[in-house]
Amino acid sequence: MLLPIPDVLSPAQLSQLRAQLDVADWADGRITAGHQSAQAKDNAQLPEDSAVAREAGALVLEALARSSTFFSAVLPRRIYPPLFNRYSGGQSFGYHVDNAIRYDRSRGGADPVRTDVSATLFLSDPDSYDGGELVIEDTYGTQSVKLPAGHLVIYPGTSLHRVMPVTRGARVACFFWTQSMLRDAAQRRLLFELDVSIRRLTQDTPGHPSLIQLTGVYHNLLRQWADV
C-alpha cells in the first residue's frame, strides 16, 4: 500500500528540523547502503551516530507517535531510527530495493529490524528544487511522489524505487523503515481499510450496535495475524 500522510510535522517542528539540518555536517550517503544499492546511490547523509541525527530523529518519532493514520496503516512494532539525506547538484539514487533487514546501530547493531514498510518524510518545499521525485514501482504501475514539506509517504519495503536527479536547489528528507506487527502487506491494507470504515461509521452513525461487532472483527483479525 502506497499512502501519503499529510502534515505529520507541524510548521514549528519543520522549522526546528530545518534549522538543525541546515548547519549539519553531511557525509557520503553510501555509508548506509548495501552492496547493490551503493552502486546506484549518490547523495549526502547525516551520520547515524551524530548528535544532530539523534535529536532530529527523536523529533520525528514524537511526531509519528501522534499520527493516528501512520499507526493505523503501519501497525508498527519497531521503527528503525530515522535517517536524513540531501540531494543537490544532479545527485540521484537509481532503482533499488531496500535491504530486508537493518541492524539498529543505536542498540549496538544487535537488534535486527525487518523492513516491512519504507517511509520518506519530505523536509523541503517542492518549489525549492527541481527533480527529486520518489518513483515507486507498485502493483498499479509507476508512481511518482513529490510532497509538500512535512508530509510523509509510506510504501511496502519490497518495492523497487528510485530518486530522480535534483537539478536545482536541494531536496532534504527523512527516511526510515518500520517492522510491522503484520508482515503481510495485504493484511495491513485490509485492516487499515476496516479501521477507516469503522471511524467513518462512528462519525456518521454514532452508537450503532454494528460498530461493536465490526470493532470486534478488527481486533480478532489483528489477534490472529499479529506477530508480537
UniProtKB/Swiss-Prot annotation:
Swiss-Prot/TrEMBL keywords: Dioxygenase, Iron, Metal-binding, Oxidoreductase, Vitamin C
HAMAP family linked: Hydroxyl_YbiX
One of the Pfam families matching this protein, by short name: PKHD_C
Residues that hold 2-oxoglutarate according to the record: 171
Name of the protein described by the UniProt record: PKHD-type hydroxylase XCV3086
Signal peptide: none
SMART domains: P4Hc
Species per Swiss-Prot/TrEMBL record: Xanthomonas euvesicatoria pv. vesicatoria (strain 85-10)
Xref: InterPro entries: Oxoglu/Fe-dep_dioxygenase_dom (IPR005123), PKHD_C (IPR041097), PKHD_hydroxylase (IPR023550), Pro_4_hyd_alph (IPR006620), Pro_4_hyd_alph_FE2OG_OXY (IPR044862)
Required co-factors: Fe(2+); L-ascorbate
